């Protein structure tokens, strides 16, 4: 069964609801914000043109599509792209400045695959099953990455929480 293409109103609704979070996710994958916006727009343009369509979950499809597009862009550049200077995606506006800095540092210290899993779970609000679909990994692998990341964050942030 061929997936049905989305109409313009459906694509617009998805963009309005998830465009910013998708761009933040692309920043998590190693691109600056301007490149992240370009990647997200390219994915939505393909949806509008009917060249791609979500198979199961539109949200999981979008995260997988922007992830793949960002990796393709990085590969095409064939150079190291620095993480965006503005790391607003790392923390919400809550907490003290010291706590926010500690969380940013702890997240930066995680291996890329664990940081990506944390982002999708916490900031994108995905289930582990949706994350497995986005990353094209077994559910147990995603669950392990999430658990290990939480353990590392807990160890790293425990001293900060005591102050």
How does the language model describe each region?
Residues 1-24, 34, 53, 115:
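A short, charge-rich alpha-helical start-of-domain segment used by transcription regulators
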Residues 67, 129, 135-160:
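DNA-recognition helix of helix-turn-helix
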Residues 9, 76-77, 84-108:
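Acidic, proline/glycine-rich intrinsically disordered inter-domain spacer in sigma factors
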Residues 14-33, 48, 66, 107, ...:
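Amphipathic, Lys/Arg- and hydrophobic-enriched alpha-helical face
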Residues 19, 23, 44, 111, ...:
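C-terminal flanking helix
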Residues 64-84:
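Arg/Lys-rich amphipathic alpha helix in sigma70-family domain 2
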Residues 38-45, 49, 56-68:
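Structural recognition of an alpha-helix C-terminal capping motif at a helix-to-coil junction
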Residues 117-121:
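A short pre-motif secondary-structure segment
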